[in-house]
């Protein structure tokens, strides 16, 4: 039997927008979300680094390609030890990106276009240059335990003081660092320059609610919460911190994977915190009106944990605990592999909560063209936009951008830079990203081929396929995904994925995706005649062509098509 799912790809077609039989859905449930890495989207002042004015100038593009909301990677004041994920002032914009006035202008323009703005919210830690940390080091009143501090353990053999536990940071090495001035260890789940805030302290939680309110008052539509699993740690009743057991996954005790992080990830208090923040946002909406404010949770956690973050029978949590399952697909993945990845989410999240979201990529992961191959970029875009729920696209994936080899210089090498290179707008100087003489990261050598301007003029380009997919989101068939039988998905062969979206009355879309490198012959898929409405570059079919699915059809290698049936 076919499994859940189905979303479509629409090309330039007339879509039925009647909503017969569709359930009420909130805006985020069927949204097209788009991540912008601000340093790399658009430079407005010629310094080679993207900024807020640049983003504002390009918001019309997001409207053009059908984006519902965009979330911005951190733009707050920061020494940039971790490119903005080390925040020294949660209430201001880093001068690299502009000013609060620039941000307000961006909000005004976004609202005029109907594009929602979501901010990256980094609550787990701050920069060690944040005034909160400086006050905590000095034990100033109210800030003494604003961060996680401990005396450590006395080594009976050496007489020296050792860290409180064997915990290892995400970036390797001890999670505890000695502060000479305070004469205590502080905790940092990430870099040493990113000390962890102490969320067991009510004052910390109040400060973070104040941060949320500050940006809500400026007009943002929600927050993507960074590093959710790391917010709380377990502490024993006697105040000590337990050692974590060895995982068996590695041989280097300084590597993060060496231990099983049962005391430093996904603690029960983190779930309660998500419920607290959701209640805060819902109350804000009740008092101020407008659409729902949304919470996205970045959590590389089990689906059972993500289910808890979403909510239970008595509490609501993050609307979109981010689903990274499709990011684990490779160039060798078959249609059956894709179904397995979909099932992992749907067997829990859809069954329990009737919710789904699908992430294509992000600033920490190689681009689709590198993970799966350039010939499969359109296939993944088709899949994530054909499945029920929200889709999350990393900037540039809609035009098939690839990683760039970035040479290590100086005393550091950021191995995530390859997927963070400037957006490719045109084939001109610096891809029209910047008027400067250089850009903060090098452009792809392929930018003259893969860019927005060029792809606008190619009917089956990745960009136009992407735009066609977004058009289908307003069709009655796509809006019926919460109705019984509104979608299904299955691997009809080892390599061919089929997704169906239907309102069960007057409209049905059938999406076929050939993940393999060989032709696929399909016989008797349905006793009806359909019409092709979208076909990728590898297809021999064209929009408007009829297809009798009671007969045989053939899919070329790496071909994806969308067919429509109307009563």
Swiss-Prot record:
Q: Name one GO molecular function term.
A: alpha-1,4-glucosidase activity
Q: Which residues are glycosylated?
A: 30, 124, 198, 312
In this UniProt entry, which residues are annotated as the site Transition state stabilizer?
364
Question: What EC number(s) does this enzyme carry?
Answer: 3.2.1.20
Instruction: Supply the alphabetized keyword list.
Output: Glycoprotein, Glycosidase, Hydrolase, Signal
Top-level EC class, please? hydrolase
Q: What family does the entry list?
A: Belongs to the glycosyl hydrolase 13 family.
Annotated protein name in UniProt: Maltase A2
Phylogenetic lineage: Eukaryota, Metazoa, Ecdysozoa, Arthropoda, Hexapoda
